[in-house]
């Protein structure tokens, strides 16, 4: 940006700087005739992002002005691209008349487009919510409290809640996946956001609690916020006030479609942290795509708003038994006789009613939006008829909330043409007969074609010039065109209007008089259409609340109808949810895996209860341990949404959280190793799980040395079983841990089976009681394509190591010989006792001490850091011979 005094700039550039100073961090589209121009740093940024030409427009203040421009008729495409990149755009339109302006044409900010406040259909992803999130921070009693508020501008859904701690902050950010985040300039957890784009920093005063409180009660026309249940959430209120003002500023509207605020309570839902969302691949797979996810399998909704609601339900499973059972009853009723099929066609007519109503409220709805609104309203009575004999209470409630609107539906049917234009300014919106004044004005424009044809015929006859044509263009208006060859034959009353390469264009007094009349009629008809259109929007806004109620009910019906269709198509059954404790599943399946594999999926059972709350899972790699664990979590999650589940039967006690620690990778940006990520996730589980939590842990301790990893895994299992007493599936390759089932009252071993056939491993994927007897590591390596020479060498080394460590090759079991120093032999007396603090593990001697001092001394003298593997093997043989 130029630093020269304002007086050194041209009047137009001074006008530009005045507008730009109001929005220094956003790209300013400055309308100049048929183009939007960007200057200085904005031009450079837009050139880089949009791959458009960067040029210069003269000088201002003695400095060349970098400039980039785009045609105004293509602006929406460019703005959409910028918004998808996380940029915000300010559009300045010409509001003055260039013909009468003495200085630069007057310009004003017409709209502000930011990633989180868009409502235009062209900018939105159909099946993804577009959330604007606001965060405020407070310190209370040594805790970091983060106030969340978020708004879906395209639907008017406005929510708030609070969490404490950076881990919860990160988890909620992943759940909501906002397009834009508002924070104060002094926000202390900026690094946790992990975003480069889509963050808007505001002055700290925007998050002032008192002004935010006033902002909210003014919006909802209430005396206070006690009716919303958020009076004590001061951080959340501060964030919500800042968000609401920001949304009003960008939309230049009072936001009439935002009529309430919903408070989210932690105890209402099953909490799922960020690691669990990743591992369960709810809507994003582990590689960042959307294929082979739970949503891809489940989402066969008929409306986009149903698809978005389904995703919300999956990300926020509920704990209210009454609500869960109400949903189940609807699914069961719709599943009977496949009655869900009858709803598919009328629901498809509804379309994205939710977002259409948002644009109606913001006065940005386009003519085709109103046509789709008409189709949606015409479907309502049909859906009411299908629900008339519903027996479940929830379906009866939904039927009452789906309100037919016969008056406005008839108005829309009479008003709109069958194929309205995409924008109001083009005209041609209203059907003939809707408005008498408009019909008269349109008749003048329509008659122009007949008039021009008749004039062309008569002038040809009068002048004898066969090449004469009568036409119209937007720049020069109406004209008579004669080829250059015959232009000298033009009558004297023809007035030359334009010279072309091969022709001359003329005007006559008669044609000029008609032009004035026709153009005036066109201008008046467009003005009348705009007037009628605004009146129609006003009429719709008078019943906006009722229309939103209908929209919400239709979205719920769509999701529940989808659940019924999926239950029938995928052989899902209704689970029993209760508060008695325990999780029992018969014939459970993984809903995503079974949809992508060609062979039949092998179902498995689960039995967790107070006396058997922890399962130690062993078995070969690729044997199905992770799939088994994930399917249990997904079945549990689905059950808490009211959806039927992939199992023969399921009885599930309501859980408060679902945790997973399954696989890790380096967090390079955060400077954390794989093991550090693993331990952070483990710590989160151990610190936050309760007796009613479901915990899935896979390969804890594998990222460090064997003894360190084994010790950590051992201690974690002990803590989960004795202190937390939650429901745990713990998969491991540390076979020493299987001895814990003999020592912990509430632990048991299960394993995934495999067998060898003609030197090849066959995975049976079936869960059986007891620990695994073999790991099949070399066979899996061979399947992976490891060279035969390497496999052969590994087998040789395995035999040497088995001799050293005392593993029996004949039986191929992991049991150690009687005289070996195994963990199992030294931990039979392991006991856990309750202390005053509730948990104190008794010290266990996991690693046997040498029985002879000489052997101990020999071990201590070994310089392990400087020994080769062969030297180490040789030393071990020598030591073994001394036993």
Curated annotation (Swiss-Prot):
HAMAP family per record: MutS
Any one biological process term the GO annotation gives: mismatch repair
GO CC term, one of those recorded: cytosol
Family: Belongs to the DNA mismatch repair MutS family.
This protein's name: DNA mismatch repair protein MutS
Chain's role: This protein is involved in the repair of mismatches in DNA. It is possible that it carries out the mismatch recognition step. This protein has a weak ATPase activity.
InterPro entries in the cross-refs: DNA_mismatch_repair_MutS (IPR005748), DNA_mismatch_repair_MutS-lik_N (IPR007695), DNA_mismatch_repair_MutS/MSH (IPR017261), DNA_mismatch_repair_MutS_C (IPR000432), DNA_mismatch_repair_MutS_clamp (IPR007861), DNA_mismatch_repair_MutS_core (IPR007696), DNA_mismatch_repair_MutS_N (IPR016151), DNA_mismatch_repair_MutS_sf (IPR036187)
Domain of life: Bacteria
GO molecular function, one term: damaged DNA binding
PANTHER family on file: DNA MISMATCH REPAIR PROTEIN MSH1, MITOCHONDRIAL, DNA MISMATCH REPAIR PROTEIN MUTS FAMILY MEMBER
Binding residues for ATP: 619-626
Keywords attached to this entry: ATP-binding, DNA damage, DNA repair, DNA-binding, Nucleotide-binding
Underlying gene: mutS
NCBIfam families linked: mutS1, PRK05399.1
Pfam short name (any one): MutS_III
């Amino acid at each position: 940006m130029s630093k020269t005094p304002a007086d050194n700039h041209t009047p137009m550039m001074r006008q530009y700087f005045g507008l730009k100073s109001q929005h220094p961090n956003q790209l300013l589209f400055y309308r100049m005739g048929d183009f939007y121009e960007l200057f200085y740093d904005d031009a450079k940024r837009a050139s880089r992002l949009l791959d458009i030409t960067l040029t210069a427009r003269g000088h201002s203040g003695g400095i060349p002005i970098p400039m980039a421009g785009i045609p105004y008729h293509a602006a929406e495409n460019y703005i959409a691209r910028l918004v998808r990149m996380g940029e915000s755009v300010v559009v300045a339109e010409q509001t003055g008349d260039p013909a009468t302006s003495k200085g630069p044409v007057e310009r004003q900010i017409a709209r502000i487009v930011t990633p989180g406040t868009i409502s235009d259909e062209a900018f939105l992803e159909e099946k993804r919510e577009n959330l604007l999130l606001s965060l405020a921070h407070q310190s209370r009693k040594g805790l970091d409290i983060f106030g969340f508020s978020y708004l879906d501008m395209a639907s008017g859904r406005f929510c708030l809640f609070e969490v404490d701690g950076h881990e919860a902050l990160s988890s909620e950010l992943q759940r909501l996946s906002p397009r834009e985040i508002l924070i104060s300039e002094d926000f202390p957890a900026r690094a946790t956001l992990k975003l480069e784009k889509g963050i808007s920093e505001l002055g700290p005063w925007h998050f002032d609690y008192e002004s935010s409180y006033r902002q909210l009660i003014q919006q909802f026309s209430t005396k206070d916020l006690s009716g919303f249940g958020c009076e004590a959430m001061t951080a959340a209120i501060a964030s919500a006030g800042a968000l609401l003002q920001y949304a009003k500023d960008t939309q230049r509207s009072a936001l009439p479609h935002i009529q309430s605020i919903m408070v989210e309570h932690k105890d209402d839902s099953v909490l799922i942290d960020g690691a669990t969302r990743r591992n369960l691949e709810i809507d994003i797979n582990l590689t960042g795509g959307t294929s082979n996810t739970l949503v891809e399998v489940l989402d066969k909704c008929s409306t986009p708003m149903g698809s978005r609601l389904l995703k919300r339900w999956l990300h926020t499973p509920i704990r209210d038994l009454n609500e869960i059972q109400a949903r189940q009853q609807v699914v069961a009723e719709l599943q009977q006789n496949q009655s869900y099929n009858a709803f598919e066609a009328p629901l498809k007519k509804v379309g994205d009613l939710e977002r259409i109503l948002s644009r109606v409220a913001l006065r940005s709805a386009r003519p085709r939006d109103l046509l789709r609104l008409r189709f949606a309203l015409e479907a309502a009575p049909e859906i009411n008829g299908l629900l008339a004999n519903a027996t479940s209470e929830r379906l009866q409630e939904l039927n009452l909330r789906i309100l037919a609107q016969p008056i406005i539906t008839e108005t829309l049917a009479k008003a709109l043409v069958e194929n309205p234009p995409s924008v109001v300014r083009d005209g041609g919106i209203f059907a003939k007969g809707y408005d008498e004044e408009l019909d008269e004005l349109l008749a003048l424009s329509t008659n122009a074609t007949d008039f021009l044809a008749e004039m062309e015929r008569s002038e040809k006859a009068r002048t004898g010039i066969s090449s004469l044509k009568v036409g119209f263009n937007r720049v020069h208006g109406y004209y008579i065109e004669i080829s250059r060859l015959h232009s000298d034959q033009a009558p004297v009353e023809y007035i030359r209007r334009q010279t072309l390469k091969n022709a001359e264009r003329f005007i006559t007094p008669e044609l000029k008089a008609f032009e004035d009349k026709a153009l005036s009629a066109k201008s008046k008809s467009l003005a009348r259409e705009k007037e009628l259109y605004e009146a129609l929007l006003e009429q719709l806004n008078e019943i906006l609340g009722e229309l939103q109620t209908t929209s919400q009910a239709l979205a719920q019906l769509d999701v529940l109808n989808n659940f019924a269709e999926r239950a029938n198509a995928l052989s899902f059954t209704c689970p029993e949810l209760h508060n008695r404790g325990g999780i029992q599943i018969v014939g459970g399946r993984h809903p995503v895996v079974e949809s992508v594999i060609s062979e039949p999926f092998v179902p498995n059972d689960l039995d967790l209860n107070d006396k058997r709350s922890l399962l130690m899972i062993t078995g070969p790699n690729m044997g199905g341990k992770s799939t088994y664990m994930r399917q249990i979590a997904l079945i549990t999650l689905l059950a808490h949404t009211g959806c039927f589940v992939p199992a023969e039967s399921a009885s599930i006690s309501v859980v408060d959280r679902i945790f997973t620690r399954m696989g890790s990778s380096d967090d390079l940006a955060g400077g954390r190793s794989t093991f550090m990520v693993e331990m952070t996730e483990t710590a989160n589980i151990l610190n936050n799980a309760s007796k009613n939590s479901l915990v899935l842990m896979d390969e804890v301790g594998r990222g460090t040395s064997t003894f360190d990893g084994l010790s950590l895994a051992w201690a974690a299992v002990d803590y989960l079983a004795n202190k937390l007493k939650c429901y745990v599936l713990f998969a491991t390759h540390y076979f020493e841990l299987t001895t814990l089932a003999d020592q912990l009252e509430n632990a048991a071993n299960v394993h995934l089976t495999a067998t060898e056939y003609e030197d090849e491993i066959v995975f049976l994927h079936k869960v059986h009681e007891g620990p695994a007897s073999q790991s099949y590591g070399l066979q899996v390596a061979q399947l992976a394509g490891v060279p035969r020479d390497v496999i052969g060498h590994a087998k040789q080394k395995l035999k040497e190591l088995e001799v050293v460590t005392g593993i029996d090759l004949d039986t191929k079991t992991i049991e150690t010989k009687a005289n070996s120093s195994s963990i199992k032999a030294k931990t039979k007396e392991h006991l856990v006792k309750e202390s005053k603090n509730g948990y104190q593990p008794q010290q266990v001697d996991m690693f046997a001490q040498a029985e002879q001092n000489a052997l101990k001394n020999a071990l201590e003298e070994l310089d392990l850091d400087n020994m080769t593997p062969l030297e180490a093997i040789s030393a071990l043989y020598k030591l073994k011979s001394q036993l």
